Every structure is written in C-alpha cells, then in structure tokens.
Amino acid sequence: MVEQDPFEIAVKQLERAAQYMDISEEALEFLKRPQRIVEVSIPVEMDDGSVKVFTGFRVQYNWARGPTKGGIRWHPEETLSTVKALAAWMTWKTAVMDLPYGGGKGGVICNPKEMSDREKERLARGYVRAIYDVISPYTDIPAPDVYTNPQIMAWMMDEYETISRRKDPSFGVITGKPPSVGGIVARMDATARGASYTVREAAKALGMDLKGKTIAIQGYGNAGYYMAKIMSEEYGMKVVAVSDSKGGIYNPDGLNADEVLAWKKKTGSVKDFPGATNITNEELLELEVDVLAPSAIEEVITKKNADNIKAKIVAELANGPTTPEADEILYEKGILIIPDFLCNAGGVTVSYFEWVQNITGDYWTVEETRAKLDKKMTKAFWDVYNTHKEKNINMRDAAYVVAVSRVYQAMKDRGWIKK
C-alpha cells in the first residue's frame, strides 16, 4: 500500500512546480484546495432484502477552464483524500492536453466483487440521484475508473436522463459509455494509443528510430496489452518483457501480444508462457531496454532501484509509478520520463471527443478520432518537452508548469484572483 497521504503528495507536487513559475501566493493557496466536495449517503436494497448504506464522494477540484471531468471509482478502501488528489491530477491532465475542462473525481466505498449486477445497478442509480444537482453535460462529466465500466456508465446516464426528463443532451453527461448509447468506438485502446504517440515523439526528440528497438511493459491489463500490440505491430518494436501482478516473462527475440493475452486468459497470468523465461516484476524494471512502460501500479520506481533503470525512455501509463526521489535520479542519468498525466491522457482526450460528439450529434470514424488524438498528444508532448528544455527542469515539473500556468491564466481572466 502507498504510505504517503495522496492529497499531501498532490499539494507537494503543485508547490514544487510553483518554484519554476511566476505565480502569486493567493493563486497558489486557491489551487491547493478543491472548489467543491460533495459527500453523500446512498441506501441500496441488497438482494437478500436488507438495506446497506454506502458513502459516496464527488470532488470538483477546479472549473476555471470548463466543466470538471473525471472518473468514478468503486473501491472498498476508497478515501476522500484519494478522490481529492485524483481530482487535482485530472485538473492538470486536462490542462496539459489543452482540453476545455477542469478536473473532478468521484468514488464510492464498496466492494463490487461481492455485489450482484442488480445490486451494482441500484448503487449506480442511487449515486446519480444523490449527486444529480452537481453533474450535467455542462458542469461536471463523470466517466469509468477503478471497478466501474461502460455498463455502469449506461445505467448512470439512464438515471440522469430519467430525472432530467431529457432536457439537455443527456448522452453527454457521462463518457465511457457503450457505443449503443453515445459511446465512442475508439475508447478501448485510447490510453495506450495516446501513450504510443508520446513515445514516438520522445524518440524523435532523442533522435531514436523505434524500429527494432526494445520495450518492457509492466502490467498486462487493458493499457499494457494494447501498448504491446501497438508498439510491436505499428512501430516495429520488440516487446521483450511483460508482467502482471503474479510475475513476468522475458524473451529477447520478442513476444506476440495476442498470444500472451490468450495465455493470460487461459491460465490467469502471463507467467510460464511457452518459449519465455519467467522473471519478477522487479527484474523487468531493470532490464536493458530502450523503452520502459510501467502500466500497472504506483510507486514501482523508487530511490532503491532508480540507479538500476537502464531504459532511455520511461513512459508512465500507470498513475504515479515513479517517486519524487527516483524522478531526480532518472533525470540526473539523462533518462527521459514521459510523466503519467501526459503519457496516459489519451483516455480523457478520447472521452472529450465522445462528449463533443454527444453535444453536437456529429459522430466520427475511428480513423478520424485517432488522427485528432495524434494531433492533441503530439502538441501536448512538445509543449512539455520545450518547457523542460527552456527551463532546464525535469519533464514532470515541466508538465506541471504548462498545466498550472493554463489554469492560473483562466483564474486571472475570470477575475477570481487579481494577480
């Protein structure tokens, strides 16, 4: 488990970025606090006839740049501090991507693994009834996150529409929906595809040709699998190692993404894949590869192993895989980190495209969506990279400077703060 309080980390990162910016004390004070926190109690009738009361949250961190945007997490250990931190990070993520959004996040303390589909539906609808007054297509737009999925989003959207009597473009109140109810087809691989564009641009910045180069991917869920598939099939890279929570596999000649996925589905893990050597998650991180993509959990690159990282590019598909101490070590070693809230922003960017289509009624092809995503990710990468070069600071600090500057400007233009 993560030791530090998540919201304290978020505030520290903001304070660190402020050192490299011309930002007033009052603006910084404002940015250290969420604009709105909603806590709700949701009574849900369980299948056995009993009623269980769940606690839910919705945090709208900052709406200077537009409606707040962010996922809904269902987790037995959900805390308000985590939701606040993630809402702050969503604020910077939408700003670094230059999307017309602020940042938000929601959560419910529950264990979905122990709930039936009927119970989940009742909880989803109850949550929407509880937070109905603070969400809409123009104020706060939720999406799926930990243990929530397109089906749960469809129930939530339906409940919102039932209450609102379809008075606004209600498909646009929630993103990450099934395509049959206004969802976007390109959402499935959006996070990995967005990350692949940033890796391509990082390689250009380093003068590296990706064809034939090696990549190791920690985590083989949605993002890890699609990252392996895209980097090998579209960029000609060799995926030499992948892992999941039970361990990893290594093959210097390269692994086939689809075959490994089929093996994982059959056995429950990538481990023992035919023709590959079993390795630990720790060993995977320290392999001699060109690109390392931590795509699983937080805080895996720490001061203990940072010195042993040999990759030239670290692409953070996971949230917070590198600790601040490790950041410094990797920067000193000349390793280029593509920070999480830039690298994994493909998901929220395609969510934005879904929302635009729901509001306008204009639906795009997968090819059009990918071309627009490419353009957005490429511009965001160079905005951050150029700031990193100009200010001589690491990529994470540069991403914060770009993002916070944009939110700060919007706050000044609105007259919320005078300087």
UniProtKB/Swiss-Prot annotation:
Binding site for NAD(+): 219-225
Reactions catalysed: L-glutamate + NAD(+) + H2O = 2-oxoglutarate + NH4(+) + NADH + H(+); L-glutamate + NADP(+) + H2O = 2-oxoglutarate + NH4(+) + NADPH + H(+)
Listed GO biological process terms: glutamate catabolic process
PROSITE patterns: GLFV_DEHYDROGENASE
Subcellular location as annotated: Cytoplasm
InterPro entries: Aminoacid_DH-like_N_sf, GLPV_dehydrogenases, Glu/Leu/Phe/Val/Trp_DH, Glu/Leu/Phe/Val/Trp_DH_C, Glu/Leu/Phe/Val/Trp_DH_dimer, Glu/Leu/Phe/Val_DH_AS, Glu_DH, NAD(P)-bd_dom_sf
Family matches, as Pfam families: ELFV_dehydrog (PF00208), ELFV_dehydrog_N (PF02812)
Protein name: Glutamate dehydrogenase
Main location as per UniProt: cytoplasm
Domain of life: Archaea
